[in-house]
């Protein structure tokens, strides 16, 4: 089996695994590492096919979750996933109820695609991205990154930061990226997450154009024991646009649920 790239940092007693989103890699967390490393031992990974974790075929969500969990340096951890990484973390939490201490999703949805009475990204838009990747790889990735920061005061700087993360490591293949878009287009974990055993924290950006804020209220009703926080001035990447507020909120939520060691 191919090996995933893992990096472990920090000196806290609580283990926190960070899973990045579509098109990115583990460097996306740089803005919060120093803020969290005294509270957690952080485990950063490049998901299969992304960054330094090359040589993987196109994977289903279940396959990706299984590979990440099996190679994790510490399994008894809080699993935090951003965007697509939120689906991976959710799948891991559902499949490994005795190991996962808590699940935290950031700017993520158990169902990214819009359906009747469910806000999200129109499936044909995701399908269109798949086609555009084949036509103009770099332009499509740039467009997707720009969508993630749209509306924030620091949108231009945040997009530049995301682009730098992408370019700093080996680029994922068109096939890997299309596989990720297919997961976003087709996966629906809404019902399964009602059976989740561990604490579940959800963090959102008020200005997020990919995961509409209405999702938070709908899931508040569906998962009454799961606290949610909406960052008023953030979009799809609150830990980049508002790293201090994000880190403070994360710690407060973990303390409130008594999941810090």
Swiss-Prot record:
Its EC number is 3.1.1.85. Its main location: cytoplasm. It holds the Pfam family Abhydrolase_1. The active site is at 83 (nucleophile), 208, 236. GO terms for molecular function: pimelyl-[acyl-carrier protein] methyl ester esterase activity. Keywords: Biotin biosynthesis, Cytoplasm, Hydrolase, Serine esterase. It comes from the Bacteria. It is an enzyme of class 3 (hydrolase). GO terms for cellular component: cytoplasm. SUPFAM superfamilies: alpha/beta-Hydrolases (SSF53474). Residues 15-243 form the AB hydrolase-1 domain. Pathway: Cofactor biosynthesis; biotin biosynthesis. The keyword Cytoplasm applies. It catalyses: 6-carboxyhexanoyl-[ACP] methyl ester + H2O = 6-carboxyhexanoyl-[ACP] + methanol + H(+). InterPro entries: AB_hydrolase_1, AB_hydrolase_fold, BioH, Carboxylesterase_BioH. It is found in: Cytoplasm. Substrate binds at residues 22, 83-84, 144-148, 236. The physiological role of BioH is to remove the methyl group introduced by BioC when the pimeloyl moiety is complete. It allows to synthesize pimeloyl-ACP via the fatty acid synthetic pathway through the hydrolysis of the ester bonds of pimeloyl-ACP esters. Belongs to the AB hydrolase superfamily. Carboxylesterase BioH family. PANTHER family: HYDROLASE ALPHA/BETA FOLD FAMILY, PIMELOYL-[ACYL-CARRIER PROTEIN] METHYL ESTER ESTERASE. Monomer. This is Pimeloyl-[acyl-carrier protein] methyl ester esterase. It comes from Proteus mirabilis (strain HI4320). The lineage of its organism: Bacteria, Pseudomonadati, Pseudomonadota, Gammaproteobacteria, Enterobacterales.
């Amino acid at each position: 089996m191919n090996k995933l790239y893992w990096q472990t940092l920090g000196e806290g007693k609580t283990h926190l695994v960070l899973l990045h989103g579509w098109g990115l890699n583990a460097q996306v967390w740089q803005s919060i590492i120093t803020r969290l490393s005294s509270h957690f031992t952080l485990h950063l990974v490049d998901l299969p096919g992304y960054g330094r974790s090359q040589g993987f075929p196109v994977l289903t969500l279940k396959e990706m979750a299984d590979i990440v969990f099996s190679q994790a340096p510490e399994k008894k951890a809080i699993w935090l996933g951003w965007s697509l990484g939120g689906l991976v973390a959710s799948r891991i939490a559902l499949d490994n109820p005795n190991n996962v201490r808590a699940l935290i999703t950031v700017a993520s949805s158990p169902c990214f695609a819009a359906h009747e009475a469910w806000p999200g990204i129109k499936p044909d838009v995701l399908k269109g991205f798949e086609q555009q990747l084949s036509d103009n790889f770099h332009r499509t990735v740039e467009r997707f990154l720009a969508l993630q920061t749209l509306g924030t005061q620091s949108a231009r700087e945040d997009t530049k930061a995301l682009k730098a993360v992408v370019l700093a490591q080996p680029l994922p293949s068109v096939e890997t990226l299309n596989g990720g878009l297919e997961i976003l287009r087709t996966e629906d974990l809404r019902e399964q997450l009602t059976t989740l055993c561990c604490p579940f924290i959800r963090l959102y950006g008020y200005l997020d154009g990919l995961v509409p804020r209405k999702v938070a209220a709908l899931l508040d009703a569906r998962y009454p024991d799961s606290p949610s926080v909406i960052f008023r001035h953030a979009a799809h990447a609150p830990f980049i646009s508002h790293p201090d507020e994000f880190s403070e909120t994360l710690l407060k939520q973990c303390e409130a649920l008594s999941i810090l060691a």
